[in-house]
Amino acid sequence: MLKVSVLIPVWNQESLIERAVHSIPLRDDIEIVAVDDGSTDDTLQKLMMLREERNDPNFVIISLPENKGVGNACNVCLDSASGEYVVFLGSDDYFFTEAFEEAMQLLDGTDLVYFDLRVNNGDIWKLNKTSKKVFVGAVKFMRREFVGDSRCPEIRQAEDWFFYQDLMGKNPTEAFSGLTVKHYNFPRKGSLTYIANEEKEKDEWRRR
């Protein structure tokens, strides 16, 4: 039985996708679902090479004919997953492989299981109930049955913020492990313009 589906929405990351995939343990109970969102570089070819290299029957690659944004790509990932739990991996992020395997032992039916992460400057983000970082880039293993039909809005930025707000509205059971499982590429675009655009997306969504 597949325990975890690692979901990778990707667009034009041929130089970094290999690192992300190599960080995922090769195990019979782990599935990779990579959705190429209409890349114009060699990302799709790199994914196919990596699947052949791993010789992994649980490595699913889906190629979308045109770029529709990360929200849509995330939803295709969720629709295609088969594991008991799902976890997103940004194509420019990577797991700490041994810690990932330790984390799998803690998946005991809890709806959302959180793990700490490391960011670009080496800081460790410790996640807990009151942490504002819980919704941004956090390592969340999500029980797929609990996720149900919750999906990301098909917007260009901040789609995960709305997705996790939806999940929290379902009153999930939660656990915080303290394990550092992922390196998170943050800030991805540390400009004020990026922050302003993200807030604009949230405002537009609230008005719908």
Where in the sequence are the language-model features?
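Cell-envelope/extracellular polymer assembly enzymes that use nucleotide-activated donors
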Residues: 3-5, 31, 162
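Donor nucleotide-sugar binding loop of glycosyltransferases
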Residues: 9-16, 39
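Short, well-formed alpha-helical segments that are part of the catalytic scaffolds
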Residues: 13-26
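A conserved acidic beta->alpha catalytic loop
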Residues: 36-45, 66, 90
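Glycine-rich, basic loop-to-helix element that forms the pyrophosphate-binding segment
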Residues: 64-81
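Short aromatic/hydrophobic "clamp" motif used to bind/position activated sugar donors
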Residues: 86
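Conserved donor NDP-sugar-binding/catalytic core segment of glycosyltransferases
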Residues: 94, 100-125
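Conserved nucleotide-sugar donor-binding catalytic segment
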Residues: 127-199
